[in-house]
């Protein structure tokens, strides 16, 4: 099993780079919020480490959940990937998910001050993995999948912001916290749409925004989102 998981994670979720990303995402929102609130007296400790690990572990859960959800289509479109090719078994990944969620839950219950926000984050992720109980509708509509799934980045941002506000006794309902929440959400939204835009000659059976709306309109929409994010 360990060899199979090594193949999977090397291909789909490289540990070191994703762990580093987890701490970068947590630290980025953490320090931008403190900077804009004018907090200069801050302390780093086990809670910040748990926060970074939570981002890493949650994104790993989403990665595996996506592989479960897309198994049938991946067998046709991406047959060489670790899961659809049989290089790793579903039972292997189920064990990883169980251990991952158990460890994250224990760490957050013991060390973090925003456990309710953690539960909200996990509830949203689990609902995503189940297509919000509307697979027959969402799986057939790329825009509907975007509307229901992409806000998870905002929920993840909210988890980090809530921790900071509680730890440093900051009033949460301000324009500052709202802008931090939305500003750091847009890069994820832009990336999610942009990665599904292709030139006409590169289109395949895979559903893309360029196939649905044309590559020109899709590209213009990305430019508009980028300008909104900058402003």
Predicted regions and their residues:
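Multi-pass alpha-helical membrane architecture of UbiA-family
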Residues: 1-231
């Amino acid at each position: 099993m360990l060899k199979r998981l090594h193949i999977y994670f090397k291909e789909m979720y490289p540990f070191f780079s994703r762990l580093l990303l987890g701490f970068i995402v947590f630290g980025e929102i953490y320090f931008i919020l403190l900077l804009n609130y004018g907090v200069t007296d801050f302390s780093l400790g086990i809670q910040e480490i748990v926060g970074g690990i939570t981002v890493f572990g949650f994104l790993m859960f989403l990665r595996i959940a996506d592989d479960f959800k897309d198994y049938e289509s991946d067998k046709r479109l991406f047959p060489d990937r670790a899961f659809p090719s049989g290089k790793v078994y579903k039972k292997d990944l189920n064990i990883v998910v169980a251990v991952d969620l158990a460890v994250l839950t224990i760490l957050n219950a013991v060390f973090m001050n925003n456990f309710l926000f953690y539960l909200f984050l996990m509830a949203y992720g689990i609902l995503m993995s189940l297509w919000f109980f509307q697979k027959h509708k969402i799986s057939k509509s790329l825009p509907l999948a975007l509307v229901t799934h992409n806000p998870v980045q905002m929920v993840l941002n909210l988890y980090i912001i809530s921790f900071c506000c509680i730890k440093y006794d900051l009033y949460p309902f301000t324009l500052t916290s709202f802008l931090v929440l939305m500003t750091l959400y847009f890069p994820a939204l832009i990336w999610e749409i942009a990665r599904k835009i292709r030139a006409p000659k590169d289109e395949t059976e895979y559903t893309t925004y360029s196939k649905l709306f044309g590559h020109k309109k899709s590209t213009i929409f990305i430019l508009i989102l980028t300008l909104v994010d900058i402003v």
